[in-house]
A protein has these predicted regions:
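N-terminal single-pass transmembrane signal-anchor helix
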Residues: 1-16
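Conserved catalytic core of two-component sensor histidine kinases
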Residues: 1, 28, 35
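Aliphatic-rich helix starts adjacent to a transmembrane/signal segment
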Residues: 14-31
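Short, histidine-centered active-site or binding-site loop motifs used for metal coordination
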Residues: 19, 38, 103
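Short, surface-exposed interaction loops/tails
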Residues: 76-136
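Extracellular/periplasmic head regions of type IV pilus-like filament subunits
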Residues: 36-95, 136
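Conserved short-loop catalytic and cofactor-binding motifs
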Residues: 3, 22, 53
């Protein structure tokens, strides 16, 4: 019985880590798909969608069961820089729109340096980087 308990104490954390990596990979894939759908919308209508509902993705949830976050800077108006996600130097990650998942903790803050943002799955550099905010 002690051997089974020991094996379980080793296997469960490994399994949980694998599940979390799979959720992150799924969020990254979803963001790539959304990015492609946003680009097709922009080509067709010569503007970015105001929200994800315009590309029929308003109810899409991330792997942690939270909605994906999207902000079109054109729709946000002149104060968009205050709402944009920012890197370690407080420079906006993108110049047209932000798209991200709030990650496992379901919380986020504008600068990536905020503790709540570390597990966010972000799109930065106009899609040149999609991954964990903590890795950017």
């Amino acid at each position: 019985m002690a051997i089974i308990a020991t094996l379980a104490s080793i296997a469960v954390p490994i399994y949980m880590g694998l599940m979390e990596r799979a959720r992150i990979a799924k969020a990254m894939a979803d963001i790539r798909i959304l990015e492609s759908e946003i680009a097709m919308f922009e080509l067709d209508r010569t503007r970015l969608p105001v929200n994800l509902g315009e590309i029929n993705r308003a109810v899409l949830k991330d792997p942690w069961d939270n909605p994906y976050e999207y902000l079109s800077f054109a729709a946000a108006g002149p104060g968009w820089k205050g709402k944009a996600r920012k890197d370690h130097f407080l420079v906006p990650l993108n110049s047209t729109y932000d798209l991200y998942s709030k990650g496992k903790n379901g919380k986020s803050a504008s600068p990536l340096t905020a503790q709540a943002s570390g597990d966010d799955v972000i799109r930065a550099n106009h899609g040149g980087y999609i991954g964990l905010a903590s890795g950017y």
